[in-house]
């Protein structure tokens, strides 16, 4: 959760709840029927990954409203992209899969919520984290500061896993 959340820092790449719905609706419009059933579920996740293009939601010059800015498109891409570590974990793994497409607009909160609950929050990621930030940011930033860096005063916005490779491997 941390690298994509860092892409939303300062608010430039952050998607508000209406923009998350816009994204979720676009994913469903393009991918829901791929399994032959229009049911609000993206069952063919890999097929959707191959065909969904978030750039289609990018705002035209001067456009605002039902579109995403360049920074927001990059943040969405960061959420879906595989994260590559510049070192190997203890088990030899060097990457973490990106989030699958589907479920972006799932309503609700807590463990059953979609992106607003887990990834974007009601406000852009802040440091220190606030209750209106996403669950992923609250948990992730706390874990990085207290478990990995072991420094409650670290500016998590500047966190880079490579600096803590030994701790991450433990």
What is each model feature region?
Residues 1-170:
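C-terminal His-loop and adjacent cap/lid subdomain of alpha/beta-hydrolase
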């Amino acid at each position: 959760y941390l690298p994509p959340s860092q892409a939303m820092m300062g608010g430039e790449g952050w998607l508000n709840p209406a923009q998350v719905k816009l994204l979720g609706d676009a994913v469903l419009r393009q991918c829901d029927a791929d399994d032959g059933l229009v049911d609000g579920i993206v069952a063919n996740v890999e097929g959707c990954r191959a065909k969904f293009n978030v750039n289609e939601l990018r705002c035209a010059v001067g456009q605002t409203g039902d579109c995403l800015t360049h920074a927001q498109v990059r943040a969405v891409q960061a959420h879906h992209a595989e994260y590559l570590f510049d070192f190997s974990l203890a088990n030899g793994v060097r990457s973490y899969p990106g989030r699958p497409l589907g479920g972006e607009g799932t309503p609700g909160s807590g463990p059953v919520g979609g992106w607003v609950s887990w990834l974007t929050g009601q406000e852009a990621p802040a440091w220190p984290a606030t209750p209106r930030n996403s669950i992923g940011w609250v948990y992730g930033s706390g874990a990085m500061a207290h478990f990995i860096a072991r420094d409650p005063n670290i500016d998590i916005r500047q966190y880079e896993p490579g600096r803590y490779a030994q701790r991450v491997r433990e």
